[in-house]
């Protein structure tokens, strides 16, 4: 039995209970998805090259940088269902904030990212099909302005990003999530 002497210790105890419960509840989904991920290659795409491209000239630090992108990728993997194109979700994770000019309000960065990826369509993204490229472009363009699209891949991209809003002090509202799995995780973030 723990002797909790202050609110901080109590808070940490609840945090770890939530973490362990969440991990236990979703290990089936994770193992199922990891199996799919191993089976689905990134075609001729080199995710490390995409990461390096995203990091090139990055000046805004970690709030919207690599640690955030890695969490978005992880969230997307957890949220993905069989109809989601995981290649698009993983690319979105590293490219959606590439064109941010500040860590505050930058509503146009999604549109700028969509324009930017057109510039790498025939180099870093040459392995994408036209459909995958269109999904990636729309996900980047709309991720700050659109609640949901009805497309499972794009909506998974949105929720993967939204589930990391706590890093900037914003708790994602379950009813503002684009997918049912995103809604579930948003409801259970505080447990």
Locate predicted features.
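Catalytic Zn2+-binding segment of zinc metalloproteases
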Residues: 100-108
